[in-house]
Regions:
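Short surface loop/edge beta-strand patches of beta-sandwich-type extracellular domains
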Residues: 1-10, 54-61, 112, 142-148
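Extracellular beta-strand elements of beta-rich domains used
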Residues: 14, 70, 124-129, 175
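Flexible glycan-contacting loops in extracellular carbohydrate-active proteins
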Residues: 44-46, 93-123, 148-154
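Short, aromatic/His-centered strand-loop micro-motif at the edge of beta-sheets
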Residues: 46-69, 114
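Extracytoplasmic low-complexity segments
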Residues: 91, 140-209
Length: 209
């Protein structure tokens, strides 16, 4: 993330589909700061959690081979941090901080540059970062898309196969927001900003309401 990634309020959200559960599987975030992931030494592989400067998890278990919408919402004014699944709040905790600085490495489907094992085994779509605390209704009603010009939309990666382009040997996923924070698509080892850039695989997304 760039130097503007300093948040007094924040929302992570994504559509996720797990092929296989394994320990420490990252959805998105900044390791050691604020990360949204599955599993840990004390958290089962099929349980989602928030870790970093605030840490907690719901008791809810997820099923493999099923689409879910997940969201992490932080409001610095109250320090309340909440986890939502398909628009329903499933856990909350009061953080010890009132802001987050995510300037630096931020990954989707990957943890950090020196542990290539903590990758996402599955699919994702509609990955977004907001500089506002989204409400339950906003999360529930906009799972499959939002207006790219929405107030507070910090970064928006649809991952739908139409937003990928290649430049100078790398593949990028276009940021659909007005902020031009395009993401680099990588696979395998990632060291100090370097690694194999690959074209993302695209599958049909089928959701049963």
């Amino acid at each position: 993330m760039d130097e503007k990634a300093k948040f007094n309020a924040l929302t992570y959200e994504a559509m996720i589909y797990v092929d296989t559960f394994k320990k420490l599987s990252t959805v998105m975030g900044a390791e050691g700061n604020l990360i949204f992931r599955f599993g840990d030494t004390t958290v089962d592989a099929d349980q989602i959690q928030v870790a970093g400067n605030v840490q907690f998890n719901p008791s809810k278990k997820f099923a493999a081979k099923q689409w879910y919408h997940v969201a992490l919402v932080f409001d610095g004014a109250t320090k309340r941090t909440e986890i939502y699944v398909d628009g329903e709040r499933v856990a909350e905790k009061t953080a010890s901080v009132n802001s987050f600085n995510l300037n630096g490495n931020f990954f989707i489907g990957y943890a950090y540059d020196y542990d290539g094992s903590r990758t996402w085994r599955g699919k994702m779509s509609e990955c977004r970062v907001w500089s506002v605390a989204r409400t339950a209704n906003e999360l529930k009603n906009n799972k499959l898309g939002v207006d790219p010009n929405s107030e507070g939309l910090f970064g928006y990666w649809k991952l739908n196969g139409t937003d990928v382009y290649q430049k100078d040997g790398n593949y990028y996923v276009k940021d659909q927001s007005k902020n031009h924070r395009d993401a680099t698509s990588r696979r395998g080892a990632y060291q100090n900003g370097r690694g194999l850039s690959v074209e993302p695989d695209v599958v049909e997304m089928r959701i049963s309401e």
